[in-house]
Structure formats: structure tokens, C-alpha cells
Amino acid sequence: MRWAFLYGYAGYGAGAARNQGEQAMEAFRNVHLFDEGGPVLIFGGPYSNLQATQAMRAEAQRRGIPSERCICTGDVVAYCGNPAETVAEIRDWGCAVVAGNCERQLASGAQDCGCGFEEGTTCDLLSAGWFSFASAALDQDARNWMMELPDSISFGRGESAPDCFCIHGGLTDISRFLWSCSPQAEFDEELRELATRSGKGTPNYVFAGHSGIPFDRRIGDVRWINAGVIGMPPNDGRQTGRFVVLDQGKVEVFDLAFDHIGARAAMEQAGLTQGYHRGLTSGFWPSEDVLPPELRRDVKAG
């Protein structure tokens, strides 16, 4: 595992600096994993969902994809009922992890998730409950591990000009929500920031997370792929998470079935009954505040 340190960047951009409790980062940190071909499994948002994390690990093993070729786009800890156990499972598995906003916030001892929710929205209000539960459940060793996670992960084609980069939300803002319908200018801004920070030009692929809904969009010569998350359904009425596999230039999105009944029970046992527990079994989020209008259910149904 090769670490590349690029100095001169204090934080993740103005919006992220606010979200991350004014935490200053002395360097942009990228880890370059490998150059060899072969399948790569990429997933996001375990979200403290131990059942989904165990299912993802088992699926990688079933596919014969070793841990060093499995990459998480961050937010190991979030809404669900087993934050400490999920961190332990991810660490034991040994997959690579990009720092998400939740990891940055928990590592710094912040009082909120820094998710980028607008103040006063349902998502913002609900986050207070699950974030305080998660923070209380994690020991200092887990926080130290989170503190060491990189800002991005690259692989393929050589460290000097990687073929693929994995990030969380954005590089201008770790909590930036980018959707399939977001203006191209927002993606262009992120690609410029990636080129500036990495100093390695433009990759062929960017894999991201944070927003929770997978998509594959071409931005000029770059394919921007949101890998989805495994810890919560993508608001489509099904009780499965999502992940992607890149193999020989082909990207496929797959469903991940997990014990959603058990995951909901763990949330209920923890007292996390503000709505996300129902989302595990209904397949729908408790609020669509964060979604752009065209992705909300009432619009899509019409």
C-alpha cells in the first residue's frame, strides 16, 4: 500500500470546513492501491449496519475478490444500530476505506455528523439522535483509525497517472451531494479540484458515495459513478443495498441482500426509532428533504 502526500491544502473547501467543525487538514492524502488488472468491488455507506457489512464481505468472498481489491467510499458509521461492531467488521475484513464526513467528524470529536443537511430539515433533526448514539459507542482506538483514513484512493495504470479515483462526496466539500441530475458544472468543478489536488491529471473513472443512490454518468471523458450504499436501500422500495464491480472496463451495479429484519431489530434495541429503522424494511427513506425535486417519489410516480 503506497501513500502519496500532497501538501498545501488546509481542509476540504469552504463548505467542508464549516461542516467539519473548522478542522484543518495539513495535507490531502491519497493512497494508491495497485496497478494490476482484475475485478474491483466498490461500495459505500455501511452506516453502522452490521448485517449489511457482513453480507458485503461474504459477497466479495463468494466472487473471489480479495480484501485488497475491495474499497469503501466512507460513512462506515451512520444511521443504524451497530457502529462499533461495524467498524470492527470492516477493520477485520481489511478492505480499503476512504474517509467520509462521519469518520472525519467522529475522529475530531465533533458534535454533529457534518452530513451537509440543511439546518432544520427532517434529515438534520434526525441526525442528532443517531450521531450521538454512534459517538458514544466508539472508543478512542476506532477514532484513531478513522483519523488515519485517506481523502481518496486511486488504482490502475500506475501511481503517476491513476486510471481510477475513489472519493466520498466531493473534494471541494466532503459532504457535497451530487446526483444523477446535478448540473454538469458541479461535476466539472470537482474534476478540476481532483486534478489540482492530486497533481495527476484526469482519470477515466471517479467512484463516489455519500448521496446514497447509485448512478453512472459521463462527464466529458470521465465516467462519474456513484457506487450507492450498502447500509440503507436507495429509496426505491426494495430491502437491498447497492454496490458496484469494475472488471475489464465494465461497471455493473448489483443489489446486496442482507438481514434487514435483524438490522431493524438492532436499531429498535438501540432506541434508534426516528424513522430510518422503518426504511430498512420499507425500502423508503424517512425524508426526501435532501433529494432534488426530480428524484422524489411523487415526481417520479407522476
Name these PLM-found stretches:
Residues 32-41, 155-165, 219-223:
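Beta-strand-turn-beta hairpins that frame and shape the catalytic cleft
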Residues 9-13, 18-93:
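N-terminal active-site segment of His-dependent metallophosphoesterases
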